[in-house]
């Protein structure tokens, strides 16, 4: 049985709760460390999902939960905000199980039992985007959508059921070739299979965090509104809506604009 290192903070000013949990390795795991922090708006009776920002290599995104921009974005959809400090992005190390264990523990600590069932939306930068993709391949039924920004070592094997999870894959026009090619080839190899994915190129940008938040947030809100069923029971496993092949995002490569369309 895994041990839990638990810390609790109550933020009175913003009427929210912040919880910290670390999940040490057990005898079968090899992910090194897995630390999590979650923010929950005190006025939210029932959460609908978890917005998770994942850090780049050797990073730590736990402080993201105190960012008011992410808090406001999340609370509009009745989402929690999650940050993490994770070393390994390969699910066979047990890191995926550690994430699920952390959510089950947060469910008990916060008295939000729905945390054991509600879906994640993951926005990952660089290494964090690779983690988002790998976690989605491992547990597609728990992912409402994800963003992967400019990683270069995404798993290139078949994505299987993850092709049904809406994704925004972003490369930088001036980033290193191997990063552009890794993500572009994954996209091109899976679109013929019906992958519900977008490939976007940030003009004039290298390996930097995307700061066009209106664009990123629009994708998040659109996907959440389409995928989470209305009047669903959030206290049991949730069957997310599948996106119809008759809708999609059409990009204009000359103007760098993107629009949701119905065919």
What are these regions (language model features)?
Residues 3-13:
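Sec-dependent N-terminal signal peptides
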């Amino acid at each position: 049985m895994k041990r839990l290192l638990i810390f609790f903070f109550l933020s009175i000013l913003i009427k929210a709760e912040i919880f910290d949990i670390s999940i040490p390795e057990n005898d079968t795991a090899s992910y090194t460390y897995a630390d999590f922090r979650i923010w929950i708006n005190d006025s939210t009776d029932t959460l609908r999902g978890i917005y998770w920002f994942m850090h780049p290599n050797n990073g730590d995104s736990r402080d993201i939960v105190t960012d008011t921009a992410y808090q406001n974005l999340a609370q509009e959809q009745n989402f929690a905000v999650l940050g993490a400090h994770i070393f390994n992005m390969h699910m066979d190390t047990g890191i995926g199980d550690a994430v699920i264990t952390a959510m089950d523990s947060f469910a008990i600590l916060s008295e939000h039992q729905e945390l054991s069932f509600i879906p994640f939306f993951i926005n990952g930068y660089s290494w964090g985007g690779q983690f988002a993709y790998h976690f989605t391949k491992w547990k597609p039924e728990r992912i409402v959508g994800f963003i992967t920004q400019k990683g270069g070592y995404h798993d290139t094997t078949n994505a299987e059921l993850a092709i049904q999870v809406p994704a925004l894959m972003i490369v930088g026009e001036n980033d290193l070739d191997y990063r552009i090619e890794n993500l572009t080839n994954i996209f091109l190899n899976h679109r013929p299979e019906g992958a519900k994915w977008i490939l976007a190129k940030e003009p004039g940008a290298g390996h930097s965090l995307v700061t066009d938040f209106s664009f990123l947030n629009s994708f998040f809100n659109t996907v959440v509104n389409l995928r989470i069923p209305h009047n669903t029971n959030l206290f049991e496993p949730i069957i997310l809506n599948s996106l119809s092949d008759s809708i999609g995002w059409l990009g204009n490569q000359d103007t760098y604009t993107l629009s949701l369309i119905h065919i």
